[in-house]
Amino acid sequence: MSDKPIRLGDNRTGAGGQPLPFAPAMRAGDFVFISGQVAMREDGEIEPGGIESQTRRTMENLIAALALADCTLADVARIGVWLDDPRDFWTFNKVYASYFPEGGPARSTVRSQIMVDAKVEIDAIAYKPLSSD
């Protein structure tokens, strides 16, 4: 095995087909680092609607990025959340909790202006050993 991190997945494109200059996921040994996910649809546009629909799309994008490393939400050790509007916190939390019925991983949530017209961004660190030795 290489000592270098392994890039997982192809570069995605954003609005207008603009290439995004980062990997969706990187594996470094037994850890998998997921880039910040927003409510971007397959066409590169942000999911319309409020915090509920955007949180669902963002979580589904997170699940897809985890799958690149054969991981699931059960493998996630830490999540970082950025919310554009703190008034969305309770609604976001309700949708988010539905993805973790047994309780979620360690998490930080902050208010931040997001670089695209999204209401939420989520990144993650997962732990999944490459071998059972």
Walk through the language-model features, giving the residues of each:
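N-terminal presequence-like segments and the immediate start of the first folded domain
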Residues: 1-60, 64-77, 83-133
